[in-house]
Design a protein with these regions (language model features):
Chain A
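Conserved functional loop/turn residues at catalytic and ligand-binding sites
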Residues: 13, 19, 29, 33, ...
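Short gly/ser/thr-rich secondary-structure transition/capping motifs
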Residues: 49-55, 109, 129-131, 257
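N-terminal helix-turn-helix DNA-binding module of bacterial transcription factors
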Residues: 1-67
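ATP/adenylate-binding site constellation spanning eukaryotic-like Ser/Thr protein kinases
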Residues: 40, 66, 85, 200, ...
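Acidic/polar helix N-cap motif
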Residues: 13, 31, 107, 166-167, ...
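Alpha-helical recognition/docking segments in bacterial nutrient-uptake
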Residues: 1-9, 64-176, 180, 237, ...
DNA sequence: CTGAAAGCGCTTACAG
DNA sequence: CTGAAAGCGCTTACAG
């Protein structure tokens, strides 16, 4: 298909057809309330007749408003981060703002270069999954002077704003529950990343303070059912009498449930299992997975809302928003 | 934190410091090979000293190249589409091209408005999940005169290019396999969307041509394990002697496996089960799920490659790329 | 190998 | 309620 580059319609084409100035066309498109109805109608008709679509590069250059929010994620392949992006997307919908997506595939190097690439894009706000830790990156973001929302991890000193929950708190919550249920040989299984380690720490500290024994197995695992099987295997090897396990996410927990079933170990009779994330998978499994509810979508949506509020210059709000944690006790303990 | 809007560094600041013209700075940044090494070094040092980051809106306006590829998905919340986006992202990495993400939440209305919003953004290419069916939308995209890659669904008449597989072919492949394995009471379960219905059609046609009875249950289900349970229930209600079921995706199939286990129905003895998508979940389940391998990432990556090649004006290649289908026979039939 | 001039297509004050 | 002028910060030919 040989397509001739259509000579695109510009704002002065519309102005000429409508018999007004370019500025009136511009105004009709962005502040129609400031234009006399009759004029507005003529302009709108001209826009439709010509199929005029404003050039956003020109608009962004002149107005210093790109209508773009950057979102930086470790990987869009992990459903929890995808859900967070979806929350941001829904928050932005209706404002005609678009998302510029940066996926750095868990590579620190790609993260830095993406941050710099996004920095040149006149973003109106930036939302990142995780905290920005590098001093030079923080300085870069600060120099941009745009709203920045760090999500998932909480910190006392966000670059600008943060929305998330305490990973140590999640671990501690799970341990407290197990202790209260009379379990005494506890274990944690999860990824060997910053979030996993924080959950492990909160879990084991609380367990030991409660006079229970506790092991933590953190490994380079993704969000894979098969990894849950492996973690279970390692946990039982390290601490054979384990009677309660907290996994860093529901997928790992379901993997462990499958492995426990294959081994004929009763849940929760022999071992109690708890996940994190409240995924549909855990709800549909039998026995239904107990979990700590952390809703990825409900991190993304407020992050988007906060970014919008900051862009509008209203609702300063708190610097740090803790979305909190809820224990969802179901059948696995 | 009260941040003063940093007076941003512009290209002429760099030019002044380096003692060259703006144009030489510009050239150093995009075609360093055309600049004398000594000059280049001076410019690069000035860029670093000042922390200069080019304004991409101005660059896009002047060069008519935005460095942005649009990606339109029904929802980023479905992991298969997220994987496709990840494939596109990886394909674009290293070219300093960014993804503008449009998530329309399966709403035809939002899809149309997003398409129009993206149309104004000087995209260098557009990748969409699914086919663009509306004539007005197709006309809009054609008028943009940019590469367009439709993914997942195949068609003989793409707007520009298409990468995907035949949904009817997938259904037919599953049915042929079941027939060859001596099954005679077949069923399909899946979503009541365009892809689900096409898979159902291919499946039932082939089944009946093979003298097997076949029912197809298509419902408004997402990609949920619980939906797989429900579909199984409905299938057995409609056709109690069903001995082989093809599900539109692996998640539904695993849901059915859980339900079959709860009901004490042997797999594959009593019922054979096959999914589609080759998800890790199916591989980690026991018995391991047989599936038709369709790799979402491997649809996204070539889509990105094709877009890049078209942007570069090289490698015309075929208009339609069929990524093909592979039957992965494991333990469930 | 380097630069002066013109222009990309909008919007921002400001004036009336 | 509407418009003339200036400018946003780059890059594109073109010339030398």
């Amino acid at each position: 298909m040989l397509v001739m580059k259509a000579p695109s319609v510009r704002i002065d084409d519309v102005a000429r057809l409508a018999g007004v100035s370019m500025i009136t066309v511009s105004r009709t498109l962005r502040r129609p309330d400031l234009v006399k109805p009759a004029t507005r109608d003529r302009v709108q008709r001209a826009v439709e007749t010509l199929g005029y679509i404003p050039n956003s590069s020109a608009s962004a250059l002149a107005s210093r408003r790109s209508g773009i929010v950057g979102v930086l994620v470790p990987t869009i392949g992990n459903s929890i981060f995808a859900e967070t992006v979806r929350g941001v997307s829904d928050s932005l919908a209706g404002r005609n703002m678009q998302i510029l997506l940066g996926d750095y595939g868990y590579s620190a190097e790609r993260e830095r270069s993406l941050l710099r690439a996004l920095a040149g894009r006149q973003l109106e706000a930036l939302i990142v999954v995780g905290l920005v830790r590098e001093a030079s990156d923080r300085a870069l973001l600060a120099s941009l002077a745009i709203p920045v929302v760090e999500t998932w991890d909480l910190t006392r000193k966000p670059v600008d704003r943060a929305v998330g929950f305490s990973n140590r708190g999640a671990g501690s919550l799970a341990a407290r529950h197990f202790l209260g249920a009379g379990r005494h040989s506890l274990a944690f299984g999860g990824g060997n990343d910053i979030r996993g380690r924080a959950r492990a720490q909160g879990f084991t500290e609380t367990a030991r303070r409660g006079a229970a024994s506790a092991v933590a197995v953190t490994r380079d695992v993704g969000t894979a059912v098969g990894s849950g099987r492996e973690l279970l295997d390692e946990i039982l090897r390290q601490q054979p009498d384990t009677d309660a396990i907290f996994f860093a996410n529901d997928v790992l927990a379901v993997g462990a449930l499958l492995e426990l079933r294959d081994r004929g170990l009763a849940v929760p009779g022999r071992v109690a299992v708890m996940g994190l994330g409240d995924l549909e998978l855990g709800r549909a499994y039998r026995p239904q997975l107990s979990t700590i509810s952390v809703n990825a979508y409900k991190i993304g949506a407020p992050a988007g809302d906060i970014a919008l509020a900051r862009i509008d210059g209203v609702g300063a709000g708190p610097r740090v928003v803790d979305v909190g944690l809820e224990l969802l006790l179901r059948e696995t303990g």
